[in-house]
Every structure is written in structure tokens, then in C-alpha cells.
A protein has these predicted regions:
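Short helix-capping/hinge motifs at transmembrane helix termini and TM-loop junctions
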Residues: 17-26, 48, 102-110, 114, ...
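Alpha-helical transmembrane segments and their short interhelical loops
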Residues: 76, 80-151, 198-214
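Aromatic- and glycine-rich beta-strand/loop motifs that create alpha-glucan
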Residues: 1-11, 64
Length: 214
């Protein structure tokens, strides 16, 4: 159920929004708009999965299982790591579904194994980073209502203040600065460069990886 809920919105963006906006965006030089927005939707899917991991903490607290886990003879860091890795694995599962569906909309994923390995590492670090943030926020806030409000206040600006839906070439001023300092803009650009041009910006890749590992 969680997988269906978290992937539903990005899937609607992929299927419906790309079809409607694709013809308009062709005037900007974007030939395959579905391929263009796929990287941003991959980030959105990861955010959704990691956010749902925080919701699970509240559900576990309500039924008492959260506190039973705390008194179990297991190191607490192992418990946290297990929950974070669960979110990462779910992210990979949903990203895989998104990529498979995108193939039916004329998206062609380059079969460059070496670059794909780098992309897998990037998605892993990004998902692990987001899962850690969501987990920490869920431990701080008292209930799921506040948690969902805060997560929406974080996710939506990050998504829209990026290059997820449009190129940032002709954007200037404060909006351009906000887009360029958004770390997920760089993740999206790396994924897009691979999907559209089968290229990998090693410098940008290293920068983002270091940022997520801090």
C-alpha cells in the first residue's frame, strides 16, 4: 500500500503531465519531455518513499511496537540503519518501476554499465541522505500531522526550485540562485545528462556525493 501511494503522484506526472506539456516544451528545444522530467520524478519518488519511512515511526508508536523494538537486545544504531536501508531499497524498487514505465513513452536508457553503476551509487546516497533527514524529523515532531506538514514544506520547494520540470538556462535573479544552490538540482542534472546524452559530469558527481556523505 505504501509503495502504491508514494509512486502514484510521480506516475501521474510521468504519464499525464509529460503528455500535456510535452508539445509546449518542444518549442524550447526539448524533444522528449518525458525523458527530460524523469530525473526529477526519480528524486520525487525517493522523497516520497523516505517520507513514508518517517510515518512508519508514528504508526509503530501508536501500536506500541516502536517501544518494544527499543528494549530489544539489538544495538539502536542497527535499528536505525535497518529502517534507513529499508527506505533506500524501496526507493530503488519504485525508481525501477518508473524507469520501466518510461520506456513505454519513448524514453531510452543508455546501457553504459560503468555510468549506470555511478548512477546507482548516487541514488543510494541521495536516498540514504533523505531517509536520515526524514527519520530525524519524525523523532523530533510529536505527531504525524505536524510531520506531514513539515515534509510538504520541505519537499515541494525543493522539487519546484530545481530543474525537475524546466531548464534553468533563462532564469535569473534570486530564483536562479535558489535553483543552483539546491543540491537536488545537481542530482537531477547528473541523471538527465546520462539519460539524454549518455554523459557523466564527474566533477558534479563527486561534489554531490561528498555533500550527501557529510
Amino acid at each position: 500500500l505504501t509503495i502504491i501511494i508514494t509512486i502514484l503522484q510521480p506516475m501521474l506526472w510521468l504519464v499525464m503531465y509529460s503528455s500535456v506539456a510535452g508539445s509546449t516544451m518542444q518549442n524550447t528545444g526539448i524533444k522528449n519531455y518525458t525523458a527530460f522530467i524523469l530525473p526529477g520524478l526519480i528524486v520525487l519518488v525517493s522523497f516520497g518513499v523516505c517520507s513514508s519511512g518517517g510515518i512508519m515511526n508514528y504508526l509503530m508508536k501508536n501500536d506500541g511496537s516502536f517501544y518494544r523494538i527499543l528494549i530489544a537486545p539489538i544495538h539502536r544504531s542497527s535499528i536505525v540503519l535497518g529502517q534507513l536501508l529499508e527506505a533506500v531499497l524501496c526507493s530503488f524498487f519504485e525508481v525501477t518501476i518508473m524507469v520501466i514505465v518510461s520506456l513505454f513513452f519513448s524514453v531510452r536508457i543508455p546501457l553504459n554499465i560503468s555510468i549506470i553503476l555511478y548512477i546507482i551509487i548516487l541514488i543510494f546516497l541521495m536516498s540514504f541522505f533523505m531517509a536520515g533527514i526524514c527519520y530525524a524529523i519524525s523523532l523530533i515532531l510529536p505527531n504525524e500531522v505536524m510531520y506531514e506538514t513539515v515534509m510538504n514544506a520541505i519537499v515541494l520547494p525543493i522539487f519546484f526550485l530545481s530543474t525537475a520540470l524546466f531548464p534553468a538556462n533563462n532564469i535569473h535573479g534570486a530564483l536562479a540562485i535558489a535553483i543552483h544552490i539546491n543540491p537536488f538540482t545537481h542530482v537531477i542534472n547528473i541523471l538527465r545528462s546520462f539519460i539524454l546524452y549518455e554523459r557523466l559530469d564527474i566533477g558534479q558527481m563527486i561534489f554531490v556525493m561528498i555533500l550527501f556523505m557529510i
